[in-house]
From Swiss-Prot:
This is Protein-L-isoaspartate O-methyltransferase. GO terms for biological process: methylation; protein modification process; protein repair. Keywords: Cytoplasm, Methyltransferase, S-adenosyl-L-methionine, Transferase. It is found in: Cytoplasm. It comes from Serratia proteamaculans (strain 568). InterPro entries: PCMT, SAM-dependent_MTases_sf. The active site is at residue 59. The gene is pcm. SUPFAM superfamilies: S-adenosyl-L-methionine-dependent methyltransferases. Its main location: cytoplasm. It is an enzyme of class 2 (transferase). The lineage of its organism: Bacteria, Pseudomonadati, Pseudomonadota, Gammaproteobacteria, Enterobacterales. One of its GO terms (cellular component) is cytoplasm. Its EC number is 2.1.1.77. Catalyzes the methyl esterification of L-isoaspartyl residues in peptides and proteins that result from spontaneous decomposition of normal L-aspartyl and L-asparaginyl residues. It plays a role in the repair and/or degradation of damaged proteins.
Amino acid sequence: MVNKRMQTLLTQLRQQGIRDERLLQAIEAVPRERFVDEALEHKAYENTALPIGSGQTISQPYMVARMTELLNLTPTSRVLEIGTGSGYQTAILAHLVQHVCSVERIKGLQWQAKRRLKQLDLHNVSTRHGDGWQGWASRGPFDAIIVTAAPPEIPPALMEQLDDGGILVLPVGEQAQTLKYIRRQGSEFVIDTVEAVRFVPLVKGELA
């Protein structure tokens, strides 16, 4: 049953324009039902965001795929994720690159994500309880940074932690949010707007 629901989801993602077969294989390899509350397992393969507690959500599969595809990852890409959340996006990244660094502001979510990733034998992830606005400078610079919550403006620390040629993908805004694609070229940053989105806010400073 799960396999049929997964195939339906993959078909939807292809119809929505997701073309990267390596990414689609990673999505197929990650059981989304393991990252949601038991009461919501029946919704795990619907193409929709779901609550995970603490006012946070597991992103819509299309948005996970879209943002990941924009990162243009190779197996050796150095990746930073801001907002571990349930660990679902983290797990997909872990199937695509040799190592993932992930920062989460809410301690309970960080521990739950670590447990889930371990249960799935994904040991190539380093998680940190910290302020996502500050990134993880000691592990940088990064080839790719993905942010799974929306700051009102682009955090300068994340731009600074991009390597030359690196890509930052994040939602930005408060009431009206847009997905931004930022590429570093030396000391310059090229910023493009991708599409309108809706994410929970990226809270600054305050750990929970």
